[in-house]
Amino acid sequence: MQTIKCVVVGDGAVGKTCLLISYTTSKFPADYVPTVFDNYAVTVMIGDEPFTLGLFDTAGQEDYDRLRPLSYPSTDVFLVCFSVISPASFENVKEKWFPEVHHHCPGVPIIIVGTQTDLRNDDVILQRLHRQKLSPITQEQGEKLAKELRAVKYVECSALTQRGLKTVFDEAIVAALEPPVIKKSKKCTIL
């Protein structure tokens, strides 16, 4: 049985572990437990063929910046996560996570995942963001960033309600099995 290695990265507390636990067990975890490194495996059918989807959770905290890349070798697809209610985590997709993944694994497909969509319209969250002169990240902003960074795709989900959750991993499988052809820039190069 072929194995697909999918590594999940992103800032601490954006919902990476909840995403994985909710997907693999269909239950939302009650407590926040910061991750150092964990992995999960699920069997998925693609057509008539079974695949093992190996899901590797990583710690987003800076304390683990040197340890985290040890989980990167042989990765087939990365999920770079941010919380739609954390503009700072969205900014770090571009400033930290994409550069880190590209440095260690150039050419490996990347999907950007907006998490915690169930909180996008939460009054308490909206008030907190408003006080900071911020607002939740929109789907359009996520799609624009994915295009700008040449990610395979942008997808959103809620681990709590499971809305969009299966799509995240379906897209990861497709990206791993059919890596995109990187188009060369059509700009003229003068030597």
Swiss-Prot record:
S-geranylgeranyl cysteine: lipidated positions: C188
GO CC annotations, alphabetized: cell septum; cellular bud neck; cellular bud tip; extracellular vesicle; fungal-type vacuole membrane; hyphal tip; hyphal tip polarisome; incipient cellular bud site
Residues with Cysteine methyl ester modification: C188
Propeptide residues, chain positions: 189-191
Motif (Effector region): 32-40
Chief subcellular location: membrane
GO biological process, one term: cell morphogenesis
Naturally occurring in which organism (per UniProt): Candida albicans (strain SC5314 / ATCC MYA-2876) (Yeast)
Annotated compartments: Cell membrane
InterPro entries, per the entry: Cdc42, P-loop_NTPase, Small_GTP-bd, Small_GTPase, Small_GTPase_Rho
Protein known as: Cell division control protein 42 homolog
Function statement: Involved in hyphal formation, virulence, morphogenesis.
